[in-house]
């Protein structure tokens, strides 16, 4: 028989930087999970990632206080900011431009994010990336 799931916990943790301090420690501790076990496992799995890359993680919590976790790809905004070489998006998207991304960069981001997006074709994934870029105040060229 499968373990009984008692809940899910979604966190965004920098790659290789999981530690028991807030926000990770309190979020796991109040659910009775072993904080250090998660930190060691997460850091081991994110060793190959670039340091401080934000990694969304979904932790499945079971009734016996054990857990499993699934890592997603970094947020689209992270990839867009890297491609445009900016620190943050525009405060007034649509009016002020924060930077530019090319169609090739959009395609590359769509290919990286494809497994986490709810679409079938690369073209629809590219449209999602372009929409995110526009909402950040980035112009898509090409």
UniProtKB/Swiss-Prot annotation:
Record PTM text? One or more lysine residues are methylated.
Cellular component per GO, a single term: cytosolic large ribosomal subunit
GO terms for biological process, alphabetical: translation
Gene3D superfamilies with a match to the protein in the record: Ribosomal protein L11, C-terminal domain, Ribosomal protein L11/L12, N-terminal domain
Whether Lyase counts among this entry's keywords is no
An annotated Gene Ontology molecular function: structural constituent of ribosome
Q: Which InterPro entries match?
A: Ribosomal_uL11, Ribosomal_uL11_bac-typ, Ribosomal_uL11_C, Ribosomal_uL11_C_sf, Ribosomal_uL11_CS, Ribosomal_uL11_N, Ribosomal_uL11_N_sf
Q: Which PROSITE patterns match?
A: RIBOSOMAL_L11
Q: Which residues form a coiled coil?
A: none
Keyword annotations: Methylation, Ribonucleoprotein, Ribosomal protein, RNA-binding, rRNA-binding
Q: Which CDD domains match?
A: Ribosomal_L11
SUPFAM superfamilies, per database record: Ribosomal L11/L12e N-terminal domain, Ribosomal protein L11, C-terminal domain
A Pfam family? Ribosomal_L11_N
Q: Which PANTHER family match?
A: 60S RIBOSOMAL PROTEIN L12 (PTHR11661), LARGE RIBOSOMAL SUBUNIT PROTEIN UL11M (PTHR11661:SF1)
Q: Subunit composition?
A: Part of the ribosomal stalk of the 50S ribosomal subunit. Interacts with L10 and the large rRNA to form the base of the stalk. L10 forms an elongated spine to which L12 dimers bind in a sequential fashion forming a multimeric L10(L12)X complex.
- Function, please? Forms part of the ribosomal stalk which helps the ribosome interact with GTP-bound translation factors.
The record's similarity note reads: Belongs to the universal ribosomal protein uL11 family.
* Name the record gives this protein: Large ribosomal subunit protein uL11
Q: Which organism is it from?
A: Rhodopseudomonas palustris (strain HaA2)
Give the organism's phylogenetic lineage. Answer: Bacteria, Pseudomonadati, Pseudomonadota, Alphaproteobacteria, Hyphomicrobiales
